């Protein structure tokens, strides 16, 4: 399968099965499209059929010089020979067997608090309660969860634990106890825990930042962008004050204190801010250089829900963001945007491409009372 598109002055050709990405000139771009119906998908290199080549030459010569056309078709042949164009997905028939394999648990998401100190309008967790009662995870439940992870992780050395909510900092003492317990399990079991925490920042202080900088491999800071956007969707529980003003100075200090360790500012865009590229730019202007902003998830009848007719605007925003992304990088003030962080040299391995997301098999969530 071939996927072709043009963006920011680049002609991009993707060969899906091989994972190859080619940046080409106009004549090669058009040649690839002309030849795809003829060549289709091949298991091994083939020659471009003589008739197909002549037909392509005739068609392309209407627009491009004959010498350029010949060179372009030769380049297409080189890519076919290198098995980087028109390749067949040789693993397609193995998907069923692969997904039936016995898996190990690699990661847990600990719902350390089914409670929250903000009243975000789009919260899928119903202000932290997850359509149930408010609760904080006990150390005993968390301890059993870590024991379960070690016992069911097989020979895997690196394990991940996410502290999530609600707002995890509302149960901070248990977070610290579980990190300490996890560290005690590492050497006897030949494991290494990678801890992550997601926070709205309301309860952040220097002690928490220092602990996280020692123990947390990654920190996710929840913020939606511009003040008016953030405060509309992320109000305080009592409706007084600005969550933006409460959290932004803390997040700026926290990000700076990470000193090279992973963090990112994570926002949500809704129908109210389809111009979300402005919010990403706002993150960068605040001094953050690691960021993500995701489309809201919600019922179709919610006023903030994204609708099908919004998609063209959303696609346009990603294009605008790409322009700004390149511009700022050239100016020496670049930033990383999560969805643009694609390693073109080290793409997903075959196992990952076949298995997809590990949620529910390799990655499980644990409620405060110990349910998976």
Model features per residue range: what roles?
Residues 1-106, 118:
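Flexible, acidic/Gly-rich N-terminal and inter-domain linker regions that tether
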Residues 16-17, 28, 126-129, 163-165, ...:
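Short, histidine-centered active-site or binding-site loop motifs used for metal coordination
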Residues 18-19, 115, 168, 202-203, ...:
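Short, solvent-exposed loop/turn segments at secondary-structure junctions
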Residues 64, 71, 75-79, 83-210, ...:
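Conserved alpha-helical substructure of the radical SAM core
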